[in-house]
Amino acid sequence: MPLQIIVTAKQVIDPEIPKSAFTIDAASKRVVVPSSFLPVVNGFDENALEAALRIKDTQSAKVTVLSVGKDLSINIMRKLLAMGADALVLVQDVLFEEGIDSRVTAEVLAAAIKKLGAFDLILCGRQASDWDHAQVPLLLTEALGVPCVTLAKHVEVREGRVSVERVIPEGLEVVEVPLPALVTVSNELGVPRYPTLRATMAANRMRPTIWKASDLGLDASQLQPSLQLLDLFLPTSEHQCEFIEGSGEEEVARKLVLKLREARLI
């Protein structure tokens, strides 16, 4: 029986969009991006998919990508099918319009995974590039009651166990846990494979599975966020430039040293 691998993926604002393109809706406390800028798949989640595909390259495995969100673009998410995933499941609902926090996201993911059935390995990106919270994988592993290993650089499955080479401040360490398990994958894994034209065309013919919250047995009362966002704003910065003048380089240097000492920089 093939190894059942689930990869979680998030659709995010393109991190390459310039700051000047953003605005903030003060009433809803939401980031507003012009429609000309398309969203992308979170880069760390592409690393997670690459880890899954490397396992699939060496043994029989089925890779299912699971995404939760609002206004998910099927065309954007199809890239993951083109990369080599076998199936794509999207969970989106009007109940998500008001925003769901990390806890609710993890609960929705857990419900969707239980609906999918038995699994061997869940791979998640180490964090999302929009908020950088890195909370969902840890909440998800708690909800499912499986062991978790974070910050993977290399993932290998053998004999009912997953061996993970993970990144730590001192270098690398190897951790091994029994399956089923959840592993978060870091960008140190390497560059994800690029979809071929043939794979992209094949992915365009594949239909994702689309579920609503009710399909997972969830209602509005279970989707209320625990986190209250008090304010959201673009940081402001003030730059002051002062030209130091003098009769020569030595005088300018002395004045510069005095200024730096006054500012307690030296």
Identify what each model region corresponds to.
Residues M1-I266:
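N-terminal glycine-rich FAD/FM-binding segment characteristic of electron-transfer flavoproteins
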